[in-house]
């Protein structure tokens, strides 16, 4: 595991700070569902401890919900994210954004719709969303779900509507990872976005062999926000972006 500082340029706001604290850990011979259970247990225990100490707002015991990406997306948007035509997703994206989405990829459209439309409708408590669309796999393996759709073997954890953690059943195939890097670079060029350098160290590590494992990254500052019942990330940091 690793507990330490992470940095992300060009993001500052109520839930974002360029410097933040991340807890990341891996479990060998586990899949994403086993790790998802451990994430739920960790957050539940911390939530109960915060309540017992009287931290933050008074709140009831933590409710835990598990749902597939398909179910929560269809419930809010009325379309299946795996089979809806890209043109339909682009039109839905335009409806909730002032920008043009005519040339955006399927992954970007789904990301916008989920963050702007679906996340605000998630139930209170801890929500664990799994089986994301295959186009959003990043570093995760892909499998076929019960409906015959390719899905990403990853999950995200949301506490009271705020994203806290992102986990993967880790991809181990260097050729497939190279293909994904190339595809992402192509989409960035087509969208006139800055090109990102390929992570050759990761590819070299995959060439050497990675054991079967699942990994997750959890935002500690956001978790503290929820445990203490505060509305801004600056309230749980000694030196936020504005005070540096």
Identify the residue ranges that each predicted region occupies.
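Short, glycine/acidic-rich hinge or "gate" loops at secondary-structure transitions
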Residues: 51-63
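A common structural junction motif
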Residues: 43-50
